[in-house]
């Protein structure tokens, strides 16, 4: 399912081509690209739920402190290792993620059918969430920089 999300993001969203095709047409294209029907349905449902989170009349979170500390459930810790959880905390500290967008990221991560998530895959989920939440253009650009910019020179001597 994650491969389909990446395919859609790279071929439609990130390339700035408008996604104005209907679901049946998109399903046919993804099938021609070699993806399985079951995974296609899961991926489209995942994207639909992401849009629902963003378009809801109610805020995603209510009654939260901006400087609260996130305690992860056992299931979340199983899917997001220490490195991934640390990265989410880092993104909050540099204000790429707010409390609300962090929770949206965790919600979408938990809906992926992978048992664990690599840091590189988490970065893409963050990018997808930020892209779909209006008013986060600056955070999206910062996240893009974190994904695409490679450090120059040697990190260690």
From Swiss-Prot:
This is Protein Smg homolog. Belongs to the Smg family. It comes from the Bacteria. It comes from Shewanella frigidimarina (strain NCIMB 400).
């Amino acid at each position: 399912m994650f491969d389909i999300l990446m395919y859609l993001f790279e071929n439609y969203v990130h390339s700035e081509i408008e996604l104005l095709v209907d679901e049946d047409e998109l399903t046919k294209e993804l099938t021609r690209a070699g993806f399985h029907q079951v995974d296609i349905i899961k991926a489209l449902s995942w994207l639909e739920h992401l849009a629902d989170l963003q378009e809801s009349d109610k805020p995603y979170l209510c009654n939260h402190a901006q400087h609260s500390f996130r305690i992860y459930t056992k299931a979340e810790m199983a899917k997001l290792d220490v490195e991934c959880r640390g990265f989410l905390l880092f993104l909050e500290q540099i204000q790429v993620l707010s409390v609300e967008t962090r929770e949206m990221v965790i919600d979408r991560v938990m809906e992926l059918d992978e048992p664990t998530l690599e840091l590189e895959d988490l970065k893409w989920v963050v990018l997808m969430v930020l892209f779909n939440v209006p008013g986060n253009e600056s955070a999206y650009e910062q996240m893009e920089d974190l994904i695409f910019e490679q450090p120059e020179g040697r990190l260690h001597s």
